[in-house]
Amino acid sequence: MADRPAIQLIDEEKEFHQSALQYFQQCIGNRDVGLDYHVISVFGSQSSGKSTLLNVLFNTNFDTMDAQVKRQQTTKGIWLAHTKQVNTTIEIDNDRPDIFVLDVEGSDGSERGEDQDFERKAALFAIAVSEVLIVNMWEQQIGLYQGNNMALLKTVFEVNLSLFGKNDNDHKVLLLFVIRDHVGVTPLSSLSDSVTRELEKIWTELSKPAGCEGSSLYDYFDLKFVGLAHKLLQEDKFTQDVKKLGDSFVMKGTENYYFKPQYHHRLPLDGWTMYAENCWDQIERNKDLDLPTQQILVARFKTEEISNEALEEFISKYDESIAPLKGNLGSLTSQLVKLKEECLTKYDEQASRYARNVYMEKREALNTKLNSHISGTINEFLESLMEKLWDDLKLEVSSRDKATTSFVESVAAGKSKIEKEFNESMETFKKLGLLISNEEITCKFSDDIEERIKQLRDAELKAKIGRIKKNLVPELKDHVIHLLSHPSKKVWDDIMNDFESTIKDNISAYQVEKDKYDFKIGLSESENAKIYKNIRILAWRTLDTTVHDYLKIDTIVSILRDRFEDVFRYDAEGSPRLWKTEEEIDGAFRVAKEHALEVFEVLSLAVTSDNVEIIPDVPMAEEESGEDNEIYRDNEGVFHSRRFAHILTELQKENVLDQFRRQINITVLDSKRSIITTRTHIPPWIYVLLAVLGWNEFVAVIRNPLFVTLTLILGATFFVIHKFGLWGPVVNVVQSAVGETRTAIKDKLRQFVVEDHEVKESFEMKDFSKNEQKEK
Amino acid sequence: MADRPAIQLIDEEKEFHQSALQYFQQCIGNRDVGLDYHVISVFGSQSSGKSTLLNVLFNTNFDTMDAQVKRQQTTKGIWLAHTKQVNTTIEIDNDRPDIFVLDVEGSDGSERGEDQDFERKAALFAIAVSEVLIVNMWEQQIGLYQGNNMALLKTVFEVNLSLFGKNDNDHKVLLLFVIRDHVGVTPLSSLSDSVTRELEKIWTELSKPAGCEGSSLYDYFDLKFVGLAHKLLQEDKFTQDVKKLGDSFVMKGTENYYFKPQYHHRLPLDGWTMYAENCWDQIERNKDLDLPTQQILVARFKTEEISNEALEEFISKYDESIAPLKGNLGSLTSQLVKLKEECLTKYDEQASRYARNVYMEKREALNTKLNSHISGTINEFLESLMEKLWDDLKLEVSSRDKATTSFVESVAAGKSKIEKEFNESMETFKKLGLLISNEEITCKFSDDIEERIKQLRDAELKAKIGRIKKNLVPELKDHVIHLLSHPSKKVWDDIMNDFESTIKDNISAYQVEKDKYDFKIGLSESENAKIYKNIRILAWRTLDTTVHDYLKIDTIVSILRDRFEDVFRYDAEGSPRLWKTEEEIDGAFRVAKEHALEVFEVLSLAVTSDNVEIIPDVPMAEEESGEDNEIYRDNEGVFHSRRFAHILTELQKENVLDQFRRQINITVLDSKRSIITTRTHIPPWIYVLLAVLGWNEFVAVIRNPLFVTLTLILGATFFVIHKFGLWGPVVNVVQSAVGETRTAIKDKLRQFVVEDHEVKESFEMKDFSKNEQKEK
Ligand SMILES: Nc1nc2c(ncn2[C@@H]2O[C@H](COP(=O)(O)OP(=O)(O)O)[C@@H](O)[C@H]2O)c(=O)[nH]1
Ligand SMILES: Nc1nc2c(ncn2[C@@H]2O[C@H](COP(=O)(O)OP(=O)(O)O)[C@@H](O)[C@H]2O)c(=O)[nH]1
Ligand SMILES: [Mg+2]
Ligand SMILES: [Mg+2]
């Protein structure tokens, strides 16, 4: 009888029971088994008599099906039994080895249905840990594919190769095919040929891992075939067949002995236990055995196919039916919903029969694709709507009553209207399930409308600034040129006052506070401040250009000359002057020159009346990279300062003064010439009068020889002095004499000599002062 | 015995044989069968004794397996036989109906292996066309899932529902389960319960189409169970069981009669033939039955899983191992190849065991993903390389010897070098299989390098134009202002000549032909022409601004005045004039005024010496939309013409002439005043001399009372006339008297009177001419 009841090595939850080691120890007691043990397992369809066979053959006590009740699964998991008693034809009472028998749960049970996971792992485990694997099959199963577990064996062979194919222990397994209910009509040789051929075919078709490509079935397995008679209808023969089978498990040395050394794992028993547990772990972790059921695999394949077809039909219908409706929200949405519903319905009709989770997963994916496709049209519609609403807004803003409605108000109203209509359209799409996420669209729309409003605002601002510029620039130019062409000492104070007031006047409509402006565009305080600053920059640039273009050397000389002549030619009341004496001319010259040069300094350096250099309060220069903006060189090689206040260089100042002096000297010369011609011109009738009045005196002189002699002597002396240019010494002598005796000479002589002397001194003094000024 | 041999209705290639109609006619001859016929088919695993049963039961002659040879498939396709002879327990020799029997190819044959396509279609067809479907199964198959064709039945039930579920003919099928080799240990009731429960479970799990959700198994099928004893080991009982089965096919009216009216299709025989053919077409076309084999489905699932894992591992390793190598082509490529090979090897090891085409397909997809991921790094590398090479090119271009190497040459050399290194790098990647298509990268690279060269070219061009501008603008300004400040009648000819020559001088380095320039940047002829045109536009704008800013009213008045004074104040030799008479002044005045006004016309309208208006040869104005560029309104409301040649308006011309006249009149007045003072001034010593010389005459007059009396009378008369302003009439009288007696008066008197008269006339004439000119 059996030693002990069988234990469950691996339960239905695929847990390895470590009590096996304890069981082994109970079975073998204190005996040293060493390597003298064997492991046998069984594999086959459910209720194919596996347990019955093992019990009859090895006197084990595995549960078997009670056929009188019904056909159903009995063995669950993998059970382990120990035996030393094998049913044989003759009783051999010698030292029998310990045999450990694994009864494996039957494959293809209707209880597990499509879930083949445990079957594969159990079969794999049986092959891995056994020396002999009994493959149990009904005679009638031979020739079937699924029914004879050939598909299962193929998978098991493949995984076995990848997991254990390269093992170094040259472990081989005996596959013992036991053919049940073999009635004998078909010879066993024919059946074994069929099975062998099938196995070899499977092996050829296997996907073998690297290094096992050339391997053969027989590198890993030996095949044996045994037939057993019908247990119920041929009971005696069945018993006899089983005993004959039993002989091959105990008859060492004989040809048919099954436990050949090459099948043994060569592990001590406790080593085998660890090995078995390790095998189960590896098998459990192997993902190649983690396959979805046939149902799920088919469902994935079919739902994918159906989904693609439905989408294809949707797309083919889409364009032609949507094209004419692109502008109409109502008909567009209804058509979109219709097309989408049709597509999903078509999918549902065909795909709903497949596994629900797979069907729903693919439906979600299809829904996403449909929405993605639809979103293109929705985006187009929303963009068209946006364009239309935007045109409305632009028209409304441009045609508003500018007196009663501000730009900001009309833009805000238009924006509000756009947002309302846009959101309504989007809600329509969303309510109908055509739009999933509207955050992205809303965000893009908001960015778009902000961008467009910014453009509109920029255009309005540009127009306003353009108008300001169009007035400000010429006005500034005119005012500055007018002030500079008639300058005073405080011309720059005037220019600055006018500069500020001109700016103020041109943007007075936008002033909110002192130095705070709102350009009525809806900009922030800082943006308005920046625009104000830009306007000031423009104004300063205009001032700079105007000043530096106007105040050239020629212009400044002209200004100085005008100023000089105003004072020199006209008296305080504005009447033209008539010169009587040179002293008048010299005095007027000095005053006029001083009056002109008063403004020369302000025309060459822009300073206020407090002698403070004028510096722009905003940056004017465009930053030219790598260039010093303080100094630049013109095309004549002259270096200039770019500072606003610096109008003339020292060299240019010299140039101006030279030209000015030259011109006013000419004026003075003209004036002095007018005196000379006034002074020495004696009308012709005077000579007549003198002749008439002096006739009697003249006659008296002629009659008197003394007078004649004196006249001749004086004439001759006069002639000689003049001829030989001796007036200088004569003048000196006369002057000396005059200096000594002038107090006694009459007013006439003194007056005559002094007047001539003043003219000469004036000329010399002018030359001398000119040299003196140059030296300074 | 059997009437005729069976025919093949549907062959192994799934072709429907239309000879069936002919066969029917042969079987029934000229008899009118009407609806008195029945159709039976059989379904079950291969070699399960289906054909044997049909032959025994209906005396047909279907081929059966010869068990003594080997177990293998015999029936291929679907065969049709006709019988009227049913094997029954008692011989009933009455009018038997015609029975058409379909022998269907067995399912799960190892010959077809995993290909279940025909099995499904055959089973579906059998259900569709039969009244009774015999489901043949071994007793031992009960409890198995695949082994008992339950999976197959499930698929068939599903497709049957979708294809024929909504048929209006209320067609029902009797499923007659014949359990073979029923040894009787398990009661038939138990077996039928097991099968029924299994079928009901399958039906519940079915995915039913719309409209069939609430349907029951029994809406479409009736179930019957029959057990047959072991044919070989219980031969007599088997025969008896078959006869009992046969009774149920012929015993009308009995409870167990199988051919109930609700199973009949109610079609005449030829109608049934068309129906059968139509059914087969529908079944053939149904895609739900077109499933890949389990092998392929598993392969798809597993290779996807393996591929994703391999890719995941590749990506996790990728970043940290690539990051330090991004700059080195050699080590980068070797590491990329290594990582890619590792990934593909890992995939190959696990996935190569699965169906080859699926494995290769997924491998290609994985390869594409790997390359896509790698291409990111390659793009980064190539972009970095591009940046580095580009910096080299920029350095080389900027530091070239500008005397010996042109911009175009150095750019071309640099570009060639970049392309060479870039292509070498790309070839390296391509040769190692890391890059599939390099057209896109090459195209993007070419676009990039063209864009960068364009930027470099633009910068170089901008620099060149900047230098041209920096010289051209001030030079033009100076020249124009110089010419305009000292204008001649042909000033505009001079300005135009100088304008063209200044432009020419500044771009002479780039001239190729007359009016053709190459700016040595590598631009096309049209691009060079455009740049030349832009330079001319700039020059014209400068000319326009300079002219219109300079030629203001004040400046033109100043120019005219200078020109007047040059002629009026200085004689032909350049000496200052000293006026002797008013006639001289008037003559000089006329000449000088005419000389000044010569240039007034050219200063207000820019025309050449041929009196042709100067029009710019390039468009200067920036097009301000919606604005007429011919006329603009300044800030004083005055309308201006924007045409270049129009310098002064009519109003401004009047203004200039007024100011000019006022100024030159002052000058003339000064000059005339200088004459007056010259004419009438008598030095004081003359009076002394006159007194001295005329003392004796004076005394003589005093002593003579007549002279005294005359003197008093003349003095009194003189006083009265002066007091009452009667010089006019006195002058008239004197003139009249002189006119009558002047021939007798001495030169002195005539000279005195005439000179005084000329001065007065000069004054009156000036006023009169002034009024006259104003009226003109
Ligand atoms: N026809 C037949 N039935 C058998 C044979 N061996 C066992 N059975 C019966 O088949 C049923 C199932 O046997 P069992 O050993 O539990 O099958 P297991 O599920 O493969 O272990 C039991 O009712 C046995 O009596 C046999 O060789 N031939
Ligand atoms: N054990 C057994 N064998 C049978 C039975 N009926 C037929 N066979 C044998 O099974 C083999 C196959 O029979 P066949 O009718 O060709 O099977 P089919 O492929 O289903 O048509 C033949 O050798 C028959 O002799 C039966 O009821 N029991
Ligand atoms: Mg069992
Ligand atoms: Mg057959």
Curated annotation (Swiss-Prot), chains A, B:
Entry's induction text: By salt stress.
Localization per record: Endoplasmic reticulum membrane
Primary localisation category: endoplasmic reticulum
Pfam family, one: Sey1_3HB
Annotated ranges, domain GB1/RHD3-type G: 34-263
UniProt-annotated binding residues for GTP: 44-51
Superkingdom of this protein's organism: Eukaryota
Signal peptide positions (record): none
Other remarks on this protein: Present with 2265 molecules/cell in log phase SD medium.
Subunit-structure text: Interacts with RTN1 and YOP1; GTP binding is not required for these interactions.
UniProt-recorded name of the protein: Protein SEY1
